[in-house]
Amino acid sequence: MSAAGPIAAAVGRALGRRVTAARQVAGGDINEAWAVRLDDGEVAFLKTRADAAPGEFATEAAGLAWLAEAGARVPEVLAVHDEPPRFLALAWIDGGRLDAAGEVALGSELAALPAAGAPAFGAPPPGAPAGGLRLGALELPAATALDWPAFYAEHRLLALLPHAGQDAAGQRAVEAVAERMDELAGPPEPPARLHGDLWSGNVLAGADGRARLIDPAAHGGHREVDLAMLRLFGRPAARTLAAYAEARPLADGHEERVALWQLFPLLVHAALFGGSYRGAVTEAARRAAA
């Protein structure tokens, strides 16, 4: 992209300012990411993709607003452009490291999400365009329910299983978990407001020592799911977990359910990337059912 390119021109029109420079930056597996300098000196973060679906970036923006409404720190949405070239422009966050206060604040903010709630399991953020749950290049059909075990079994595990490249043993292991969800899911929980893709790479530490949540696939779900995914690709700080537990204690048996909730993101990764994730699905299913 150049400052004279069609995306730069669209960004300028959307923001009411002229783009004077742009450089490509790291920013995800499927999108192009750019640091865009505007004529007033402000820098914006721009994510774009030639084959982005209509409403895709608008849904992400709605998710960020939904999380912010509950008290989570997120980047400010500057503009959404839902016609080609499609893009999402966010306020630039200078990177840094979480300090001790930031680790505590993150735990408290994550605990505020279930307190804010959601209308139903699977419910999208208010104002999001119609469509299913998008995770990278994968989209699950839209569905909502008030029965969490049945929802997780049908619309998460079994919906993904045909796409996850499992052998016969892996398929049987996942199906066995789905059949036992009423038993395995633990005490009933009301629908929580979830980030929906909360791995460590989507927790951005700012130069102020505080975390911002980025790249959400926000929806209503079980509150333990976000925490389980945060533990899947890294280990959240002890201060973060302690602050969460102090603000909103977890139900008995939550440690035994971590593998159960990690099964969903592992199925997503198996569907998107294959390889070792296929075996990880089988292992998680067996641990969940143990």
Question: Across the structure, where does each feature detected by a protein language model lie?
Answer:
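Short, low-complexity, intrinsically disordered N-terminal peptides in bacterial proteins
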Residues: 1-16, 37-41, 289-290
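An alpha-helical support segment within catalytic cores of ATP-dependent transferases
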Residues: 3-13, 118-193, 206
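Conserved N-terminal boundary motif of the eukaryotic protein kinase catalytic domain
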Residues: 16-23
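A short, local hydrophobic-aromatic micro-motif
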Residues: 20, 75-78, 214, 228
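ATP-binding pocket architecture of kinase catalytic cores
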Residues: 25-147
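Active-site Asp-x-Gly
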Residues: 141-153, 158, 162, 190-193, ...
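Hydrophobic alpha-helical segments that form the core
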Residues: 259-267
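ATP/Mg2+ or Mg2+-diphosphate-binding catalytic cores
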Residues: 269-290
